[in-house]
Amino acid sequence: MRILEPFREGKLVATGKVPSVVSIEMAQECARQCVLNGLAVVAAECGGTLTQVSRIVRLGVFVACDDGFSEQPKVANGASDLLQQIFGEAGRHARAAIGTNALPLNACVEVEMMVELL
């Protein structure tokens, strides 16, 4: 299991709270970037390929958000939809989408991903 922030080219894609600073659409993009970063780690550990991925077991998507914001599942869909596009049925997974007051480095999204390998 890995905890992933939305880094691209060494920088966070977006920082701040959803939706006052970061739009839902940008937060979805950040969730997708977290997944891509996680899959890069998996591929690096598996000889540069994802062929050993049996299935995606679980995602935990944490959203730094304003009080009263209740659309965390919509943000998490950015990550879930990407995994299903990549892996098909094996990309279906259990998921938690949780709102929080703050995340490390002021990230707007953080993803925890559990992958089962062959």
Model-assigned labels for residue ranges:
Residues 1-118:
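Short, polar/acidic, helix-capping and beta-turn segments at strand->helix junctions
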